[in-house]
């Protein structure tokens, strides 16, 4: 089962797939929070299933070769990595509350997340920017950068410290 849904659904869908005897490939971020991640791991063990978390750069032949060169010492001893993303995201506006479209089962879409009055800013890509459904740009893009840094350094445990900087400098929207 491949899971590519809003973040707030990842854990339940993965657990249900394991219960159904299916292996799982889940897009980033694997879960919405740490508790859900632990429950996914428990389900994988309990039902003897494979649950794989996917990030973009792991599938790139060029990146795999670069990481191999890095780990083979081509540029010496690498002791620090920085993941940087400079991306302007478009203004999503302040669309406010509106009528749920007849083509959307909003209760099903919300699923395990709190039921909020419908807003066009909660669905489609914009759900990323609302904590009930997504993890902001850290969960949307930071996962890829963190993975690449850890992979390049050859570390298999979480970092002790991460620094993040950023802000909302341009748009006055509901992100």
PLM segments and residue spans:
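N-terminal Rossmann-like NAD(P) cofactor-binding module of classical short-chain dehydrogenase/reductase
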Residues: 1-2
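Beta-strand-loop-alpha-helix segment that lines the small-molecule cofactor/substrate pocket
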Residues: 6, 11-59, 73
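Flexible loop/turn segments at secondary-structure boundaries
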Residues: 10-11, 33, 60-61, 88-90, ...
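A structural signal for well-ordered alpha-helical segments within the folded catalytic domains
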Residues: 11, 15, 38, 60-64, ...
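Basic phosphate/pyrophosphate-binding loop/patch that engages nucleotide-derived ligands
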Residues: 42-49, 65-78, 97-102
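A short, conserved acidic/glycine-rich loop-to-beta-strand motif
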Residues: 52, 79-82
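Core domains of carbohydrate- and sulfate-ester-processing enzymes
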Residues: 82-126
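Rossmann-like dinucleotide-binding domain that binds NAD(P)(H)
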Residues: 107-175
């Amino acid at each position: 089962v491949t899971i590519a849904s809003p973040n707030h659904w990842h854990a339940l869908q993965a657990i249900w797939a394991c219960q159904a005897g299916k292996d799982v490939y889940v897009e980033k971020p694997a879960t919405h929070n740490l508790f859900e991640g632990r429950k996914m791991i428990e389900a994988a063990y309990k039902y003897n299933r494979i649950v794989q978390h996917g990030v973009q750069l792991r599938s790139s032949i060029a990146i795999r070769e670069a990481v191999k060169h890095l780990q083979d010492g081509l540029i010496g001893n690498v002791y620090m990595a920085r993941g940087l993303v400079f991306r302007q995201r478009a203004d999503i506006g302040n669309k406010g509350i509106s009528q749920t479209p007849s083509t959307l089962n909003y209760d099903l879409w919300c699923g395990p997340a709190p039921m909020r009055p419908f807003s066009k800013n909660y669905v489609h890509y914009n759900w990323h920017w609302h904590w009930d459904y997504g993890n902001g740009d850290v969960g949307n893009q930071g996962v890829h950068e963190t993975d690449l840094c850890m992979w390049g350094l050859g570390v298999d445990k979480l970092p002790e410290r991460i620094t993040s900087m950023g802000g909302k400098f341009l748009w006055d929207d509901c992100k």
